[in-house]
Amino acid sequence: MSCIMQAKSAFLCVGGECFYNLIRAKKLAKLHCLGQNKIESYFSRIGVNAMNKNVALYNEMVDFFAGDARRCQHFIKVASLAKQLAESEGADAELTELVEAAGLVHDCGIKPGEAKYGAGHCTGKIQEQEGPSVARGLLQKVGYTPEKIERICYLVGHHHTYNMIDGLDYQLLVEADFMVNFYEDGMPKENIAKAVERIFKTGSGTKLVKTMFGL
């Protein structure tokens, strides 16, 4: 198979839209079949973002939580909802990408936390302590810039801290995580209403959660 054919076969089709598989691209580059610049140039010419970092990050997180369907389902939902809220709030593409990435990795501290303290004993604070170092390695692997890595790791290290929210990205991640947890935890409607009053600030998030849960 030619180098170009190998590169073409490295596509992932998600919802009818094709994205380039970054992990496969790196393997091709390491094999010196195609240089990384040539890979990017080829896919740029045919109108595909060759370096869709969040697709690669999604795959890394599925591998990270392999065998733990509950955790996989959770981060997928939080990331998707965070991205949707960002778009609804009119966030630019850069912030939307960052918020989605934060949603993907926000709970990566659970695995090392449970390894240290036992299953069911990984509190939100432990997640905040253990998560950033794991997230950093994954974000570096898929090609995020140091500046964005620092911000995403900050969000991972504070996503259970609600009195220090300092930006739209932080607020959107918290609201998305709360909405998913409301459902997954089977929280009573009156408790949801109190949490929404206390935590939710964005118009899109407030409207969605009230509509979704009939508040």
Can you name each region flagged by the protein language model?
Residues 96-119, 131, 135, 153-160, ...:
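His-Asp-centered metal-binding catalytic motifs of divalent-metal-dependent phosphohydrolases/nucleases
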Residues 7-10, 25, 29:
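Ala/Thr-enriched low-complexity intrinsically disordered regions
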Residues 52, 66-76, 80-92, 105, ...:
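Divalent metal-dependent phosphate-bond-processing catalytic cores, especially two-metal-ion Mg2+/Mn2+ enzymes
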Residues 30-50:
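Short, Lys/Arg-enriched N-terminal segments with co-localized hydrophobic residues
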Residues 53-77, 110-121:
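Active-site flanking loop/helix segments enriched in acidic
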Residues 2, 9, 41-44:
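Serine residues within intrinsically disordered or low-complexity segments
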Residues 78, 125-141:
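An active-site-proximal "capping" alpha-helix that borders the catalytic cofactor pocket
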